[in-house]
C-alpha cells in the first residue's frame, strides 16, 4: 500500500486527513446524534454500506417469515429443528469447503458475487418451477399424516418420527427453509462482514456499527409490517390466491438479490475508491513476514486457543438460542391449537410482533453510548448480554412451559403432570416466549455480533477471512444444528413431538451452558484487552 498523494489543486483539505485527526473530530461531536461517530466525508460509503446491509437483512427477514409460515402450516415445529440437525451441518461443511477453496482462487468480493448469483437462481427457480409443481414432484399431502394418524405409531414408540416424515413428505418447503438458513449464515453473517471489513479499518468498523444497526432496525421493522400486512391479506382470500401471492413474493425476493449484486458492484466502482483520510505507508518487510503466516493459517487454526474459544462462543449462542426458540415455537403451535387459530396465521402474527420489538429496541439503543463501549473497555459487557438473557429464559420460557404441559397435555417427562386440572396460560407462555426470543436476537445484534466483530478486527487481516469462515460461516450454523440435534435426541428418547415436555431437561442444559460460556468469555475478554492496550494484532495463543 502506498501513501496517497494530495493534489495541489485540492480545494477541500477536510477530505484528506489521518485517521487520528478524523477520529478526534467525530468523538468531539455534540448534539442529539453525537453517538453516531461518522465524519462528513465518510457518509457516502457508510450510507451505501448500510443500504447494502439493510436490503440483505430485509431479504433474510422476509424469507425467514415465509419459510416459517409454510413450515408451520405444512409440517410441524419440530420439523425445522430436524432440518437444522440433519441437513444443515453437511450443507454448512460443504459451503465452508467451497469458500475456503474459492478464497484460494478468488478475492472475498468475487466470492460474494458468486454467492449472490447462486442464491438468486435458487429463489427464482423455487418461485417459477419448484413450488408450482410441488403436487407432482413430492408425495401426497396426507402420506405422513395417514401413517401416523390415530396414534398408530405410539405403541411402537416411534411417534416422534412424525415431524421427520413430514420433512421428506413436504421436501419443497424443507428446501426453502434450508436456503433461507444458508442465506443468513453466508450472506448476512459472513460475506457482508468480510466485505465491510475489507473496505474499513478496525476503528472505522467499530464506529460504523451504530449506522449499520439503524439500517438493520429499519429493515426489520419494514419486514415486520410487510409480514403483518401479508398475513392480514391471506386471511381474506382463497387458497389459490394465497399460493399465487406467496410465489410472487418469492420471485420479488430473488430479483432483489440481483439488485443487491448490482448495488455492490456500483459501490466498488464509484463509492469505495474515494479515500477518506491520508493512508499511511506500510513497510514491505512487514508484508512479507505476514505472507509467511498466511501459508501457515490452516495449521494454526487447529492449534489456537483463541480461535477455538471464539468458535465455542458462537456455538454456545447457537445451542442456547435454538433450545429457547424450539420451546417457544412449540408453544406457538400449542397456543394456536388451544385458541382454534391457524398455525400459519399465529406464527406470522408473533413473528411480526417479534421483529417490531427488535427494530424499536435497536433504534432506541442507537442514540446511546453503546457504540463506544468496545472502545472504552466494555467488550466483556457486550459479549455477556446473551448470557444474561439465557438466565432470564430459565423462568420466562422453560418454567412456564413446564407448567403448561402439566396443565394441558401429557406432563413433563421427569415430573409428570404436577399441574393437572389447572388452567393453562398460553397467552402468558406465548408472550414471555416472544419477549425472550426477541431479546435473544437483540442480544445477538448488540452483544454477540458486535463483540465478535471487534475481536475479529484484531486478527491479522491477511488471514482474517479464512478464520471467520470457520467461526462465522461454520460454527454459527453448527451451533444451531447442535441445538437441533439435542432437541431431536430428547424427543426420540421420550417418544414425544412437543419439545415443551422436556423443558426441565432443557433448563438444566441451559444452566450448564451458561457456566461454560462465562469462562470462555472471561478468557476472550482478557486476550482482547491485552491486544487493544498494546495496539497490536491479537495473539492466537497456540497450544
Curated annotation (Swiss-Prot):
What are the GO MF terms of this UniProt record?
ATP binding; ATP:ADP antiporter activity
Q: Which residues form a coiled coil?
A: none
The leader peptide range reads: none
Q: Which GO terms describe its cellular component?
A: membrane; mitosome
Pfam families associated with the record? TLC
Look up keyword Nucleus and say if it applies: no
Keywords tagged on the record:
ATP-binding, Membrane, Mitosome, Nucleotide-binding, Transmembrane, Transmembrane helix, Transport
Q: Main site of residence?
A: membrane
Asked if the keyword Electron transport belongs to this entry, the reply reads no
Transmembrane annotation, as ranges: 46-66, 86-106, 111-131, 175-195, 209-229, 243-263, 306-326, 346-366, 382-402, 504-524
Question: Which InterPro entries does its entry note?
Answer: ADP_ATP_car_bac_type (IPR004667)
* Compartment(s): Mitosome membrane
Q: How does it sit in the membrane?
A: Multi-pass membrane protein
Identify its protein family. Answer: Belongs to the ADP/ATP translocase tlc family.
Which PANTHER family does UniProt cross-reference here?
ADP,ATP CARRIER PROTEIN 1, PTHR31187
Q: What does this protein do?
A: ATP transporter involved in the uptake of ATP from the parasite cell cytoplasm into the mitosome matrix. Equilibrates nucleotide pools across a concentration gradient between both sides of the mitosome membrane.
> Know the name of this protein?
ADP,ATP carrier protein 3
Q: Give the source lineage, highest ranks first.
A: Eukaryota, Fungi, Fungi incertae sedis, Microsporidia, Unikaryonidae
